[in-house]
Amino acid sequence: MSRLSKDIDSAFQGVGTKSGLEIWCVYNKQLISIPKSSFGKFHSGNAYLVLRTFLRKIESPQYDIHYWLGIDANEVDSILASDKALDLDAALGCCTVQYREVQGQETEKFLSYFKPCIIPVEGKYSPKTGIAGETYQVTLLRCKGDHVVRVKEVPFLRSSLNHDDVFILDTASKVFLFAGCNSSTQEKAKAMEVVEYIKDNKHDGRCEVATIEDGKFSGDSDAGEFWSFFGGYAPIPKLSSSTTQEQTQTPCAELFWIDTKGNLHPTGTSSLDKDMLEKNKCYMLDCHSEVFVWMGRNTSLTERKTSISSSEEFLRKEGRSTTTSLVLLTEGLENARFRSFFNKWPQTVESSLYNEGREKVAALFKQKGYDVEELPDEEDDPLYTNCRDNLKVWRVDGDDVSLLSIPDQTKLFTGDCYLVQYKYTYKERTEHLLYVWIGCESIQQDRADAITNASAIVGTTKGESVLCHIYQGNEPSRFFPMFQSLVVFKGGLSRRYKVLLAEKEKIGEEYNENKASLFRVVGTSPRNMQAIQVNLVATSLNSSYSYILQYGASAFTWIGKLSSDSDHEVLDRMLYFLDTSCQPIYIREGNETDTFWNLLGGKSEYPKEKEMRKQIEEPHLFTCSCSSDVLKVKEIYNFVQDDLTTEDVFLLDCQSEVYVWIGSNSNIKSKEEALTLGLKFLEMDILEEGLTMRTPVYVVTEGHEPPFFTRFFEWVPEKANMHGNSFERKLASLKGKKTSTKRSSGSQYRSQSKDNASRDLQSRSVSSNGSERGVSPCSSEKLLSLSSAEDMTNSSNSTPVVKKLFSESLLVDPNDGVARQESSSKSDISKQKPRVGINSDLSSLESLAYSYEQLRVDSQKPVTDIDATRREAYLTEKEFEERFGMAKSEFYALPKWKQNKLKISLHLF
């Protein structure tokens, strides 16, 4: 919320209330709001202020302020833009990160807001005419950058051309792209995006496009026409060696504190610690290529403006004012780059009340007459892994890889490593998943052998398998529905593990059915139940879970105070699955008997606070390269599918899991090599978000992206299936050529709602005992023989079951192979109030328009008889744009998780 005072500019009234961009131009010594239609058009004679708002689901909003200074902007406007940036920060509660942007040296984060590029316009901004004295003329543009393109107008002369860059010649009837012979494929592809932008915005899509290859002239009419603009062809001279900048070693960061008069005082130490930063002072951290100004919470607005002016003056005296990035940080909002210069910067973890909030919303819907099972969890994957069809599990024991029988597939041991392969069909597209499951007590040699054997299996599927490296206890939620019911026992069957146990004399720690055992029961439904054996001590208990304590022919069930009703249902079913024939003794937390405590070795303290799951706020995409065993990464801001260039390797950091995407034309040729990159990324923890080496790492190849990867993009399958390099694909797309694909494209997962995704699966049969398994190809003779032997075990019947949408009561009986549907009482409200489908025609909803205040979840006068999961659809087009900052068509083109974030921020979900 804005926090305005009489000293804050009225232009900031109501800012920061919705996600997106807001832009102002300094005009006649005051701020003028720029209309959305002019976003991305910056004039070199002006200074601008740009606010980017991101309303997060759990934490407070994220604000980034950029003040952009044109190369011809006067000093008065530049200083005013800097001061107004601080005023805007104050209006937003002093919780922003501010960046100074100089024309031609903009940060990649700033450029990412205006894809594919910004092309500064000469002259000054005029609110009446837009551009003072603008006339169309032939221009020559130089493009630099392989992932973020920087466009600069250069003199329309042959001498402006060189062999290293890509140039665009924009004429009245044709746009030429000239590619220097030393330019990369990615640079040419990015420049082609600029060509498309120019064609659409300056020529209304009505002009020809031609590409000119440096050094190729004969027989090319387009090349002849291009050179005619320069008075005829002539060789381009090579750049002299003197123009090549030598790489200098980056000096250590130097910290200064800034007094109230603006004087800089060096701290005189190269070893920096957070305790050196005092709340009532401002500091400047000079990192040579970038400078940070840190402002304590107890400093005044005047002190902050003085410190910024002093830092800018420092850069001017150093001759670095146009080449050095300046970032302004308020105490408590330090970014990862700034923190990396300090020793052991303490991590602060914000507590999350997400689950409690969802429970309150569910209760509210229930009061309104809706069945809460109709409300999908936006973070869950569609239930494409709701049965054990085509599941195979191998146990790794040194050089031996043993295929497990069907009954043993659901029994894993903490001292072993396993390969879990699952093949399923989604929208007529076959998907392959191969997990490397690492037991928490497994031997390092077995872990290495597991990865090697997994790579062999992946090789036999021609790279189609998605490889995932997971540790016990850190499995992704989509791992468990493959098993439906899974038990993890302590101990192991590996020869190496048994030798280690014998050496350490820990034989008694293995599972023994004749001795007492404690199992933690986990799962949200009968589709993903787990019983995990834990240490037989009271400290293993946790109030958030339920437990089964087996001892001989008897059993206790312990129900934590913070466990849910679904936990209790899963507990009852796991008792049956564990084959506990006796009548269990139910104990609620706080009512334990002496016998119970004695079996656990006595009463002791255990965790009693609610465990919260980690939410994906905003994924981060990085391009990566590895040279001399050193991993180098660079973040791609505001990423889209087109950023995944086929020549590169990318890392998608989702905090709770990491994806390594391999372009088909990259120099990474094996998934084992890609997995190594992912593990190195975990070790680096670039964003200092608490990544551990146990974080799941997926390896995905281009053209075989699974739905749980593409959900983070506005995904178009046809783009991923095109042939050629990045430049050839862009050119073919621009010229409208029909391109061949690598394989038949799958359905667009992103555009499908979870309702429809699940509904599509209802027509599929659920195998009651894991039958209908496919043959798993393996590269070694041993693995091939295992696949052949498996065919002899697959002779069972399957019972088709029509599963209700979002129902949690499907139970597969492992003994008789019959799927049973537990009856549950449902409200008749659904019959009285038919729900509108997620893909129904928007016009039918718009005909029932309601005001925003009526549609809010917390409305005092709520509207009834609507689809509660699509409240935004009942807004008029005008009010929708006012609230969301975009048209409905743009909104529904966003990934589902982004839609839900916006709806939650506006109290519409």
UniProtKB/Swiss-Prot annotation:
Residues 844-909 form the HP domain. Residues 752-762 have a biased composition (Basic and acidic residues). The modification Phosphoserine is found at S780. One of its GO terms (cellular component) is cytoskeleton. The keyword Phosphoprotein applies. It comes from the Eukaryota. PROSITE patterns: HP (PS51089). It is found in: Cytoplasm, Cytoskeleton. Gelsolin-like repeats lie at residues 29-79, 149-189, 262-305, 391-448, 529-569, 631-672. Binds actin and actin filament bundles in a Ca(2+)/calmodulin-insensitive manner, but is unable to sever, cap, and nucleate actin filament formation in vitro. Does not protect individual filaments from severing by VLN3 (AC O81645). This is Villin-1. It comes from Arabidopsis thaliana. The lineage of its organism: Eukaryota, Viridiplantae, Streptophyta, Embryophyta, Tracheophyta.
